[in-house]
């Protein structure tokens, strides 16, 4: 089985990325709708009280509605970052399917994937701090771990971008050679 070109593994992966792309749009829309609904219920808990018996299990949800909405909006933003990464990867796989892996635009695309991936991790740290503030009402040290796997992946992506840059340079030199 070939790695590049039409009918190859790269074209199969491009199809999978297309499906994930549209699924992420649906998930983002759903998260934003649920965030809006949770905010509406936190401001007016009697909105559906007559029609839907929530019981005691959901009594705490009214007080924590804004925090729940914050988590949903942050989740939608995170999925938006993942959507951006998937969209960039789709463009990279278009060049792989065309048999042109060292296209000069792929260098920029890989660097952008690394930046977005790192930004998502920093956003995760910020969300943990904001939620700690919202839940306790006071600024405190956030218990969390530095995800070394994620930061290693970011570094690998930047190294791959440099490998692609060198490949594009060599391809350009080969095109100039008679």
Task: Pin down the residues of each PLM region.
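Short, Lys/Arg-rich, polar N-terminal cytosolic tail immediately upstream
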Residues: 1-12
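Membrane-helix interface/capping segments
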Residues: 2, 82-101
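Alpha-helical transmembrane segments and their helix-start/interface "positive-inside/aromatic belt" motifs
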Residues: 11-32
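Alpha-helical transmembrane segments of polytopic integral membrane proteins
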Residues: 29, 33-36, 82, 86-90, ...
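Perimembrane loop-to-helix junctions flanking transmembrane segments
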Residues: 46-64
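Membrane-helix boundary elements
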Residues: 58-86
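Hydrophobic alpha-helical transmembrane segments of integral membrane proteins
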Residues: 99-133
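Alpha-helical transmembrane segments of multi-pass integral membrane proteins
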Residues: 119-178
